[in-house]
Amino acid sequence: MKILLFITGHSQINEYFLFSRFLKTLYLNNNCDIFIYCNNTNISKEIVTYYQEFSQKNKQLFITTKNGGYRTGGVEAVSEGFELGIFKEYDYVIHLHPDVFITEDEYLVTILRENLENDTVFFITKSNQDPTFFSFDFFIFKPKLLTTNIFLENLYTFTESPEHYLHNMIMKFNIKHSFIKRFNNDNWDPRRIDENLKLWHEHDLNKVVNELNNRNLL
């Protein structure tokens, strides 16, 4: 299984270090490559220091001036990854943000193994009761089965959220997808480590530091 963690961010700095501390404890750490996509050329140089905390031999830090803005930037980042050919050699691309911490990966790895040979292209989580809201902060896809860059379609004209855009493009192109259970109630609020994938989308980094200290990871 060849896996890429495609981490897309803008202004995050310390998040990368904290992300790497969780990752070092996981199966994924020795079985994935890292690509950090940052669309902020004014980012602090500290990002390089924290990027170096990742132990992967195959890792890249990509900083670009291309930034479609708050609503569009995340979709644009994944589209650019597709256009640059970054994904094509991988069985799975796991897209997430630097403040979406993978605290455990047993369930995640099981999903990847069990679905490796089938024709499901996207693996989606829900974090909102809206059935057309496909979480954009974390999703998985098989690039070898995705022959069209669906992220480019209507990229600079869509007016909805990235979550609704992801849903709409998957439906428009009739792409086979399945849902991965994340929150038991399919709702991110309150922010917490979800009950299934054990992801933690947390903006309060003091809470993250405390959790890492409790696990003796700092």
Q: Which residue stretches match the model-derived regions?
A:
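Active-site-proximal specificity loops/subdomain of glycosyltransferases
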Residues: Y37-K88
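Short loop->beta transition adjacent to catalytic acidic/histidine clusters or analogous donor-positioning motifs
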Residues: K2-I3, L26-I36, K59-Q60
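Conserved donor-nucleotide/metal-binding helix-loop-beta segment in metal-dependent transferases, i.e.
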Residues: T103-F133
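Short beta-strand-to-loop acidic/aromatic patch adjacent to the donor-nucleotide binding site
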Residues: E89-F101
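Short, well-formed alpha-helical segments that are part of the catalytic scaffolds
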Residues: Q12-Y27
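Short, charged/polar "capping" segments at the starts of alpha-helices
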Residues: I13-F17, T41-T49, Y107-L108
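Catalytic core and acceptor-binding pocket of nucleotide-sugar-dependent glycosyltransferases
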Residues: F136-L218
